[in-house]
Amino acid sequence: MLRARPEALMLLGALLTGSLGPSGNQDALSLPWEVQRYDGWFNNLRHHERGAVGCRLQRRVPANYADGVYQALEEPQLPNPRRLSNAATRGIAGLPSLHNRTVLGVFFGYHVLSDVVSVETPGCPAEFLNIRIPPGDPVFDPDQRGDVVLPFQRSRWDPETGRSPSNPRDLANQVTGWLDGSAIYGSSHSWSDALRSFSGGQLASGPDPAFPRDSQNPLLMWAAPDPATGQNGPRGLYAFGAERGNREPFLQALGLLWFRYHNLWAQRLARQHPDWEDEELFQHARKRVIATYQNIAVYEWLPSFLQKTLPEYTGYRPFLDPSISPEFVVASEQFFSTMVPPGVYMRNASCHFRKVLNKGFQSSQALRVCNNYWIRENPNLNSTQEVNELLLGMASQISELEDNIVVEDLRDYWPGPGKFSRTDYVASSIQRGRDMGLPSYSQALLAFGLDIPRNWSDLNPNVDPQVLEATAALYNQDLSQLELLLGGLLESHGDPGPLFSAIVLDQFVRLRDGDRYWFENTRNGLFSKKEIEDIRNTTLRDVLVAVINIDPSALQPNVFVWHKGAPCPQPKQLTTDGLPQCAPLTVLDFFEGSSPGFAITIIALCCLPLVSLLLSGVVAYFRGREHKKLQKKLKESVKKEAAKDGVPAMEWPGPKERSSPIIIQLLSDRCLQVLNRHLTVLRVVQLQPLQQVNLILSNNRGCRTLLLKIPKEYDLVLLFSSEEERGAFVQQLWDFCVRWALGLHVAEMSEKELFRKAVTKQQRERILEIFFRHLFAQVLDINQADAGTLPLDSSQKVREALTCELSRAEFAESLGLKPQDMFVESMFSLADKDGNGYLSFREFLDILVVFMKGSPEDKSRLMFTMYDLDENGFLSKDEFFTMMRSFIEISNNCLSKAQLAEVVESMFRESGFQDKEELTWEDFHFMLRDHDSELRFTQLCVKGGGGGGNGIRDIFKQNISCRVSFITRTPGERSHPQGLGPPAPEAPELGGPGLKKRFGKKAAVPTPRLYTEALQEKMQRGFLAQKLQQYKRFVENYRRHIVCVAIFSAICVGVFADRAYYYGFASPPSDIAQTTLVGIILSRGTAASVSFMFSYILLTMCRNLITFLRETFLNRYVPFDAAVDFHRWIAMAAVVLAILHSAGHAVNVYIFSVSPLSLLACIFPNVFVNDGSKLPQKFYWWFFQTVPGMTGVLLLLVLAIMYVFASHHFRRRSFRGFWLTHHLYILLYALLIIHGSYALIQLPTFHIYFLVPAIIYGGDKLVSLSRKKVEISVVKAELLPSGVTYLQFQRPQGFEYKSGQWVRIACLALGTTEYHPFTLTSAPHEDTLSLHIRAVGPWTTRLREIYSSPKGNGCAGYPKLYLDGPFGEGHQEWHKFEVSVLVGGGIGVTPFASILKDLVFKSSLGSQMLCKKIYFIWVTRTQRQFEWLADIIQEVEENDHQDLVSVHIYVTQLAEKFDLRTTMLYICERHFQKVLNRSLFTGLRSITHFGRPPFEPFFNSLQEVHPQVRKIGVFSCGPPGMTKNVEKACQLVNRQDRAHFMHHYENF
């Protein structure tokens, strides 16, 4: 084998180590030797890692773990550590060392140990071997609680170990495993740099050159709190190379000694070599100090410690492993602990042992060890002289006897971990041995080739037998279970026992012979032989003399041993007597003083929505103040008007309702009128002569309330500002009653009783509703159970309410008509038999019975009597004209006066009464009977039929011929297959020439008829049945929504469960789950769900994407129209999860605030470093001084603002405020990104969810910005019934669209960026565009208010619009079919309005169209929903000369709700439609059906009517339930080999 030259090896080592200088530069190349690395690497050129920082301990004996891998042995396998400590190591202090070893040697041993090994640093993830304290322990459990546990965290281990029995856990050494002065210079290059001054080769000093500077953050010095005083922080701790060099002032003194010795050598070298630079001076001084340290430790201190010398040094042995063994750590530390005295003397060079200052400025003869752990700014060590005195005192003081006894300063008052200020050093060392997996005492003896004692008494004859008995009892007399630590202590007396001596000797031999940089190794080029000899002759006494600068005679030659006759003997062997008492155990409360602040912070965060609510209230207030200024003049005029003839007051409408300001006027003719503050009449009460009026006054709570009870009316409850104002009104009312001969009865009662006695409008309406149900149940033969039951309350209030009668206005309102309509006047006058101006329920019932159950003679006689205005028994032509005009008024005035006169003449002429001026009842009945017979059966128009009525000039005939071809079955008809009824021989033939037939002619050839009879659904009676039906309809209508919400929710639950399970049970060990399981599961799970929700909520606002997708097949599965609702749902779910996320972190913050720093350093290794200070950060640090905390608070604030301002109530008050605050979403996402970027618990993951939706949303926004938007002037605006606003505006040049398409508009008065989609109701041929907008939301409601009246003259007064579109729909394909069926549900009719007008226009021009027939079916719950469409359908009917359009209207709300207006529609419609061939209420020729459309029979009959048509298009728009029924009917009909029905639908 080739041997390398030493120079080559040196160069190779320098290159490999990289330690060529302070920063690896070329400066060190000028040095004649290879500079040793600070971290221990590359000492051994074959095994580079040996002795390096972080290298694992090397076992000399196999591990002894409970599972053979890493689990430590605990109770009950082994005894309790505290019991063992008390039994084996408790004893009397004050016994001197058998060989007069000095205290300086003890602490020098600790210093040497800190140079080669450090395993005290807690490991991560945190594992605990807590020490259970026996109940009643005098130190740790004086109160006998029995639940005291001293925490013990297992040490840091090599992560590559602990995986199998062949690779058990090994602890990692946190310093270099070489005797290389790392306790002086640190164990890393950066640590050494932090200690250096980089000037003159010296270590950096503080203000006093004899002291190093204070500990700084880069050094990471261990800064445990002072257990005696609780003082903490780095202030007062010196910067040393040893992490725990400040544990005791005795270790500090040795650290200061070597600090000063290095600087002394640097100064000496600088004087000798003035041309050397800092690096050369430092490395030469360092080299010399390390060599001196090695020499003293191995050749001076170790022999005095072991009473043995090492073999002669024979040279470097590269194949010898010098790694520190765990057995050495325990053997050395425990033997040192037996020698530590309870106190330490201080003396000067003249042998004067001085007094020391203690807490409270009391003096004692020595420093008490237990009160000087981690002490800051020790008053006894403020100067160099005092440090020198401490070193001299330790050199003269004899240590404790080397036996099994450990003084109480270590056994009971060692610095404690966690919240405990004290712990048991021996018990902790026993746990440390178990943590290391140390073998038993017997196994170690075998491994080192030593004899095993046969029994307990053979251990050591010098040990107290009681100690052996107590120890043996704890081990159950099993000597094989005796642990290494206690066995080594028990075998020692005066000197380390055989086992400890063998372990220590073996370790130092390997340290010396395996170190390539050992000072005696002449091959490393460090020293010459002369320098080596000089170093060998240097002792610690020489170091002390050089540093302290004293006479050598003040010290014995060997400072580690004091021999008789040596200078300065100690006054006496120190005992605990005369020394201060050890500061007792204290248990820290990390959360002390933080509870109020934490509670206030949580409350403040919870109040963020309230703050936002207050802010929204301020905004609403200022907005309302501007509005009030505009109405100030109006209010003043109202007040003046009210002051003249009215009394202001507040009306109480009922419980849980807000009182409103009103004005009461007592008018002439016994009239009491109620107005609002705008002088709009709210209520008029007409009193009758001699009518009794009851007045009830409140007699408490300020006497401001009165109750006015008027017969046949609901009560009026008034609240006045003061009793005086109420008295003034009572006086006016009294004068009013006296003037008009009215009776007034006055009573008093409490205000609460007055409110309870009042019959409010709502109460009356509820009672009347049930009464109407019973009335119609009798008339319409409805089951009484369906009608409901009367309340069982028989109180006076109910009896009074049941006696009330309907006024003329209430009667008109019940019919849905105007009070001034002639029909209302006529019917009311007829029904009011007693002429008292009110309509009783019996009178109302009589008129209903005639309408519904009367014979044709009864009905005609009733009509005859209604319009026989002069009551002469004859109906004149003028009275007949009045009757017809009343019908026309109800029918929206669809015929002019001239046309009506012509109709009357035609009817007289057709009936043969053209020569009569008056009709008897018989004549009138004959006229109606004849028309009723003709209108009951009407022949269906055949395919392509048109031109009907062209030859008829009579208007009435034309109306008959153009009537929508609906065929209703007679009561006697039976249903036939496919919905086709039997032929009707008396039905006239319509279509072509058949339209010209006179009334009364019979059809010779029957034709197929459409089945259009409405399906009456029976109302479910039982509560459960109603709920089930409600649930079924809900699922039917929202099945797509439910599926999408279920899928989205499943994803959210999935990501929640994934993250919660991962961080709770499957994540890499980090202690966070063990520390705060509930908090981490809640916070991590909700964080993932919130990230997903807040990311994908952006897709619900991608309008252009949604517009595109709505036209694809995906619309069948995804309800794109519900994007805004889905947006709200996601937002609400996200904010709930965000609150839970915050609650989870509130739990986390509390737990982190009460967790020791050692645990937090494991959980957050990138944030915290365990420096022993224990104290965690306060709660406010987590909330306000961290990026996640501060951004989290800001996120809560932003969410509070956005959610409060987005509430429905505030949007109605200030939509602009909602729109502006909602743009905070940009800040929201910025904070979300920053919030997770800190990687406190996990790496940022928000971008994983956010990236794709953000790109899509950004692209969608760019499309919106690039789209052309045209400013349009509104030509006409009209407010239609049912809350519908009609807007007609200019058609931009080049604006092309198809019927059925929709646009997006923005009103400039409501904001230029807010667009809403609406379907065009104008036809493509029209010059203007029109929209019918129903007020269902805040924007559409405000739009209706804005266009209620123009601000200027003409169209210029209307706000302009922005127009965006048009956009396509599936309904524009209607023209591709010969026959199309349009089915609209509710407001879903709007797409078809444009289609109908477009169809009629094209047909009137004679355009060639494939479409020959349109059937328009509209399904609506109540006639209120189609009032606004009457004009459009009427226009279509008037222009439809070819009979292309057939209109069906189905009202589904009848027996199920018993709406009075709908029920009256049913009655009047069936009776009066036969008179004028128009619907009584809509004015349309189409028949209004009551029930649900029979789609399947209708489609079957449609095949019979159009047999030549092979494809029929069906287009439906409305709620999902309706479109589903249409789809189902199409599927059933398509099973037949006949016409194919192609269904296209849109849901809203």
UniProtKB/Swiss-Prot annotation:
Chief subcellular location: membrane
Enzyme kind, highest EC tier: oxidoreductase
Result when mutating R1211C: Found in a patient with very early onset inflammatory bowel disease; uncertain significance; no effect on subcellular location; significantly reduced ROS generation, which may decrease resistance to infection by enteric pathogens, such as Escherichia coli
Ranges in the topological domain labelled Extracellular: 26-601, 1063-1076, 1152-1185
Glycan-modified residues: N100, N348, N382, N455, N537
Residues noted as binding Ca(2+) 1 in the record, renumbered to the chain: D832, D834, N836, Y838, E843
Region span, Disordered: 971-991
Cytoplasmic side: 623-1041, 1098-1128, 1207-1223, 1266-1548
InterPro entries recorded: DUOX_peroxidase (IPR034821), EF-hand-dom_pair (IPR011992), EF_Hand_1_Ca_BS (IPR018247), EF_hand_dom (IPR002048), FAD-bd_8 (IPR013112), FAD-bd_FR_type (IPR017927), Fe3_Rdtase_TM_dom (IPR013130), Fe_red_NAD-bd_6 (IPR013121)
Span list, region Interaction with TXNDC11: 960-1245
Subcellular location: Apical cell membrane; Cell junction
Documented activity regulation: Peroxidase activity is inhibited by aminobenzohydrazide. The NADPH oxidase activity is calcium-dependent.
Topology of this chain in the membrane: Multi-pass membrane protein
Tissue and organ distribution: Expressed in colon, small intestine, duodenum and tracheal surface epithelial cells (at protein level). Expressed in thyrocytes. Also detected in kidney, liver, lung, pancreas, prostate, salivary glands, rectum and testis.
Catalytic reactions of this protein: NADH + O2 + H(+) = H2O2 + NAD(+); NADPH + O2 + H(+) = H2O2 + NADP(+)
Disulfide bonds: C124-C1162
GO cellular component: anchoring junction; apical part of cell; apical plasma membrane; cell leading edge; cell surface; cytosol; endoplasmic reticulum; extracellular exosome
Residues in the signal sequence: 1-25
Free-text function comment from the UniProt entry: Generates hydrogen peroxide which is required for the activity of thyroid peroxidase/TPO and lactoperoxidase/LPO. Plays a role in thyroid hormones synthesis and lactoperoxidase-mediated antimicrobial defense at the surface of mucosa. May have its own peroxidase activity through its N-terminal peroxidase-like domain.
PANTHER family: DUAL OXIDASE 2 (PTHR11972:SF67), NADPH OXIDASE (PTHR11972)
Record-given protein name: Dual oxidase 2
Organism (species): Homo sapiens
Gene from which the chain derives: DUOX2
